[in-house]
From Swiss-Prot:
Acetyl-CoA carboxylase is a heterohexamer composed of biotin carboxyl carrier protein (AccB), biotin carboxylase (AccC) and two subunits each of ACCase subunit alpha (AccA) and ACCase subunit beta (AccD). GO terms for molecular function: acetyl-CoA carboxylase activity; ATP binding; carboxyl- or carbamoyltransferase activity; zinc ion binding. Its cofactor is Zn(2+). Residues 29-283 form the CoA carboxyltransferase N-terminal domain. Pfam families: Carboxyl_trans, Zn_ribbon_ACC. One of its GO terms (biological process) is malonyl-CoA biosynthetic process. This is Acetyl-coenzyme A carboxylase carboxyl transferase subunit beta. The keyword Plastid does not apply. Binds 1 zinc ion per subunit. Zn(2+) binds at residues 33, 36, 51, 54. PANTHER family: ACETYL-COENZYME A CARBOXYLASE CARBOXYL TRANSFERASE SUBUNIT BETA, CHLOROPLASTIC.
Length: 283
C-alpha cells in the first residue's frame, strides 16, 4: 500500500508540474490543416501560409498576399464608402470591424501592379471582410478595375475569395454580378487578357459571374469552388455528396478550371503568362 501511496504522490506532483508548464505555452503554436487534418507547427506554414503536406493555402488578408505577390502596387478607389441602404441590424458595426481588421474600405483591394517589369491591373478579394462578400462598393471597385485596364490596354489578374453576394445590401449586391460582367465583356472585346486565381473559398454570386469568366482560370490547391455549399446541395438532392466534390482538384478533373498553382509559384508563373500573351504575333 505504501508503494501505491508513493506512486499517487509522484503522479499528482507530475500532473501539477505539467499543468503549470502547459499554462506557459502560448496558443496557436500548432495548427490543424482543414483539408488533410495534419497538425502543423505554425512556423512551418512559412510566409505563404500553406500546408507543407497537402499545399492547401490558408485564408489570408488581401494585403498579406500583396506583400509577396508583386514588386510595386498603386492602389485605387480607397475613398469609396460602403453604405447601409437597408439599415440592416448590426451591419454598420460589422463594417467598422472588418475595415479595421483588413485595412480595406471593402472586401477587395484593387490597383495597378508590376512583376518583373510586367504591368497589369490587380484585384485581390479578402475572405475575412464579412466572409469576402460582394457588396456595392466591391462591385464598383472591380468594375472600375476593368474599365481602367481597358483604357490603359492592361491585362487583369483577379484573386477571388468570397461567400457570395452580401445579404445585408439585398438586391443591390446581386446587381453587381451583371455590372462587373459587362465590364469584363468590354475588356475582352478589346482583346485583353483576364486571369482569375480561385482561392479558398470562392462561392455564390462571385462563382456565378466574374470568377469563372477569365480567359485563364487558375486555382490554389485544395481551394473550395462552387455555387452552393455542400450542406445546401445535400438538402436539395437528398443524398450525400463526396467531401472533395468542390475541391479545386475535382473541379480541374471535370474541366471547369485550367490549372492549379501553388502560392510560391504564383509570382513567377503569372508574370510569364502575361508576358507570353502580350507578345505580338506570338499566336
Amino acid at each position: 500500500m505504501q508503494l501505491f501511496d508513493e506512486l499517487k504522490t509522484i503522479s499528482k506532483k507530475h500532473i501539477k508540474a505539467n499543468k503549470k508548464a502547459g499554462e506557459k505555452v502560448p496558443s496557436g503554436l500548432w495548427i490543424s490543416c482543414p483539408k488533410c487534418q495534419q497538425s502543423i507547427y505554425h512556423k512551418d506554414l512559412g510566409k505563404y501560409k500553406t500546408c507543407p503536406n497537402c499545399y492547401y493555402g490558408f485564408r489570408i488578408h488581401a494585403r498579406e498576399r500583396l506583400e509577396w505577390l508583386v514588386d510595386t502596387f498603386q492602389e485605387f478607389d480607397t475613398d469609396l464608402e460602403t453604405k447601409d441602404p437597408l439599415n440592416f441590424p448590426g451591419y454598420k458595426e460589422k463594417l467598422i470591424k472588418a475595415q479595421q481588421d483588413s485595412k480595406l474600405n471593402d472586401s477587395v483591394l484593387t490597383g495597378i501592379a508590376m512583376i518583373d517589369d510586367v504591368e497589369f491591373a490587380l484585384g485581390i478579394m479578402d475572405p475575412y471582410f464579412i466572409m469576402g462578400s460582394m457588396g456595392t462598393v466591391t462591385g464598383e471597385k472591380i468594375t472600375r478595375l476593368f474599365e481602367r485596364a481597358t483604357q490603359k490596354n492592361l491585362p487583369v489578374i483577379l484573386f477571388t475569395a468570397s461567400g457570395g453576394a452580401r445579404m445585408q445590401e439585398g438586391i443591390s449586391s446581386l446587381m453587381q454580378m451583371s455590372k462587373i460582367s459587362q465590364a469584363v465583356k468590354e475588356h475582352s472585346n478589346a482583346g485583353l487578357l483576364y486571369i482569375t486565381v480561385i482561392t479558398d473559398p470562392t462561392t455564390g454570386g462571385v462563382t456565378a459571374s466574374f470568377a469563372m469568366q477569365g480567359d485563364i482560370i487558375l486555382s490554389e490547391p485544395r481551394a473550395l469552388l462552387g455555387f452552393a455549399g455542400k450542406r445546401v446541395i445535400e438538402q436539395t438532392i437528398h443524398q450525400k455528396v463526396p467531401d472533395d466534390l468542390q475541391d479545386a482538384e475535382t473541379v480541374l478533373k471535370n474541366g471547369f478550371i485550367d490549372n492549379i498553382i501553388k502560392r510560391e509559384d504564383q509570382k513567377e508563373k503569372l508574370a510569364w503568362l502575361v508576358k507570353i500573351h502580350s507578345m505580338k504575333g506570338a499566336f
